Amino acid sequence: MLEPKGYNEVQEFGEYEKLAPGGHVLRILKVEETTSRNGDDMIKIYLDTDKTDKQPGFFKKRYDSDTRANKKWGCIVNQLVIDTKTGLASRGLKTFHTCVEKSNSSSFKLIWGDKYAANFKNKLIGGLFRNEEYEKQDGTTGWSVKCMAFHSVGAVLEGLEVPEDKHLDNAVAPGYPVTNSVVAAPPTNDIPLPDDNDYPF
């Protein structure tokens, strides 16, 4: 066989690390105020695993190793501001705010108005992740690990129950059966951790 053109420049596949389902200590990188496809007010919350998590800087490492031209950040949570059924503030928004407050003690105070989104930058929050099945473009199915709920960092450190996998035909996973306890651990010293200047936004 002759050497194919561009062989030396092609990056080989590396070992694929998967985010462990369960609780993770997260750092909020950015919050954007926007609207959903239906025109409802919402916020987009960009997250990465914190340096104190058992898998520190997970989404940054994955983003950096992605060679596709249209790569996207791997952990963005969309949260509606108003409950479309009641017309009042959504429980999800209040839960997000409460979890940030509990996770950052005196270093966080909720500010409404023009500085609302900037208020969350670099704050900590706990996240509960689960395996979710999805349909690929070719019709086959695959699995990804998604943030399903916010918690305080304290709750993550105490250990959250790992939720059941969410299959395509399941609207809601029935409870959180104990299959494994996940507790955040200090990072190892041999992993380069990202700082604020390393993120793409």
Where are these regions (language model features)?
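Short beta-rich binding modules
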Residues: 1-201
